[in-house]
Regions:
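Short, Lys/Arg-enriched N-terminal segments with co-localized hydrophobic residues
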Residues: 1-7
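Core catalytic region of metal-dependent phosphoesterases/phosphodiesterases
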Residues: 9-20, 25-115
Length: 148
């Protein structure tokens, strides 16, 4: 369950919460760039979807920390229709070019950054790591993607 505390503060209680980033669905160049051991983009997409759904149930919460998918609405919708969970997307550099209003609504929330609390632990979410972030000098964790 999610209760909105302020504009970008959310508190989650009672659900399984997962964090991931940089899936790069439909990004064929990422296979070579990051030395992903897949034959092609279809093999990569199918493996990522299968692994995701083996762990995440429909009621679980997933924070995706950016670079979700390449392509247009057909590709994004095709992937989103197959993934379990309630997905919150922190926009990554590739998402900024590819996110469209038509399927942005398929996410629980899309934002450049999020402040959340899980089991009384404050967590700051962003796609890129930041040296100075809200809570950097307190007991707030920072989770990020981007650096592969």
């Amino acid at each position: 369950m999610c209760t909105k505390e302020s504009k970008m503060n959310y508190k989650f209680d009672g659900s399984k919460v997962y964090f991931t980033s940089d899936t790069h669905f439909y990004h064929s160049n990422i296979i070579g760039f990051c030395k992903r051991l897949f034959k092609n983009v279809e093999d990569m997409n199918e493996t990522l979807i299968e692994n995701w759904n083996q762990v995440v149930s429909q009621d679980d919460i997933v924070f995706h920390l950016g670079d979700f998918c390449m392509g247009g609405s057909h590709e994004w919708t095709k992937i989103l229709n197959r993934l379990n969970g309630k997905i919150y997307l922190v926009l990554g550099n590739h998402d900024l070019k590819n996110i469209r209003q038509g399927y942005a609504s398929r996410f629980e929330l899309t934002s450049m950054q999020m402040h959340i609390e899980v089991d009384k632990q404050k967590i700051y979410l962003n796609h890129c790591p930041l040296l100075c972030y809200g809570g950097a000098y307190g007991n707030t964790w920072q989770l990020f993607g981007h650096v592969h």
